[in-house]
Amino acid sequence: MDNRPIGFLDSGVGGLTVVRELKRQLPHESIVYIGDSARAPYGPRPAGQIREYTWQLVKFLLTKDVKMIVIACNTATAVVWEEIKESLDIPVLGVVLPGSSAAIKSSRSGQIGVIGTPMTISSNIYEQKIKRLAPQMNVLSLSCPRFAPIVESNEINSSVAKKIVYESMAPLVDRVDTLVLGCTHYPLLRPIIQNVMGLSVKLIDSGAETVRDVSVLLNYFEINRSREVKDKTEEYYTTASVLGFKEIAEQWLGEEVTVQHVDLDKELEND
């Protein structure tokens, strides 16, 4: 047993889609979440910058004595997950491999679509993982740089959001039977994306798939939280507006949350 929290990091609010799934599947686990909304989105940034920012978030989580880290960001997973995983002595999960595995199981035609940030798509990480596991699969990848900013600005129900999604998704319509939401922000746009693609297309939420792997690793390393301990904690931190983060978090999680602002440079200056 290990009653320490699980740490989650993301470029902003997108990783809350993973947290929501964790709260559904493993409601007894404690959580520390850090969203770097002040520097979101990560997708258009150069790899070196993404690496630097992600390591800052990791170091912040380590100050909270987490027992596991979930990189709840596809872009960060693509750039630096392997390095972080090899560097730490606690389990570190990314969101790409679980999403890839689920897509392979779902597809009947062998035609899989992947949407993500410019960095995730240009890295070809999903195509590489899928092809390694199932060489016969055909992967169609599409960069959707305007999606994450819509979510960060909480405009997911706006007419502008619908227009952008419809225009962006057009190249994949009627071409795939399975679509990987290759950015943890994208499940917040799921109803619009599903409407564009049609009900016959299976949408794969890479973050939700990752929580299944979290459960497996908790059992494997025997670091589940004791169900007899009642003082479960949830801490949410943002590098940007507390009010903006809180509004989106409460809408998505369906409950009141306390959010704290963090200045990473000051927090880690003595590191």
Curated annotation (Swiss-Prot):
Pathway linked to the protein: Cell wall biogenesis; peptidoglycan biosynthesis
Reaction it catalyzes: L-glutamate = D-glutamate
Enzyme class label: isomerase
Record InterPro entries: Asp/Glu/hydantoin_racemase (IPR015942), Asp/Glu_race (IPR001920), Asp/Glu_racemase_AS_1 (IPR018187), Asp/Glu_racemase_AS_2 (IPR033134), Glu_race (IPR004391)
Protein residues bound to substrate: 10-11, 42-43, 74-75, 184-185
Keywords for this protein: Cell shape, Cell wall biogenesis/degradation, Isomerase, Peptidoglycan synthesis
GO biological-process terms attached to the record: cell wall organization; peptidoglycan biosynthetic process; regulation of cell shape
EC number: 5.1.1.3
Catalytic residue list: 73, 183
A Pfam family reported for this protein in Swiss-Prot or TrEMBL: Asp_Glu_race
Keyword presence, Isomerase: yes
Any GO MF annotation of the entry: glutamate racemase activity
Matches recorded under Gene3D superfamilies: 3.40.50.1860
UniProt signal peptide: none
Keyword hit for Cell wall biogenesis/degradation: yes
Function (record text): Provides the (R)-glutamate required for cell wall biosynthesis.
Family according to the record: Belongs to the aspartate/glutamate racemases family.
The protein's name: Glutamate racemase
